[in-house]
Swiss-Prot record:
It holds the Pfam family DUF1414. This is UPF0352 protein NT01EI_2610. Belongs to the UPF0352 family. InterPro entries: UPF0352 (IPR009857), YejL_sf (IPR023202). It comes from the Bacteria.
Length: 75
């Protein structure tokens, strides 16, 4: 079931496009991009989420990420 969001699809897509543009302009390979994005998520959780909620938020994020990965062989 799709998750509802308080943010518009347009806002999400615009931010995603800007982040992708930064990574592409830096010619960042996939492994570096994943490392940087992972560090960004960690930083956001550690600086913006109450300590008592961090583990739950990280687990929820990881579960959502895993659920969004396609299992087809194309990439």
């Amino acid at each position: 079931m799709p998750q509802s969001s308080r943010y518009s699809d347009q806002r999400v897509e615009q931010l995603l496009s800007e982040l992708v543009n930064v990574l592409e302009s830096q010619h960042a390979p996939t492994d570096l991009s994943l490392m940087v994005l992972g560090n960004m998520v960690t930083n956001l959780i550690n600086t913006s989420v109450a300590p008592t909620q961090r583990s739950m938020i990280a687990r929820s994020f990881a579960d959502a990420l895993q659920a969004s990965i396609r299992e087809d062989k194309a990439h």
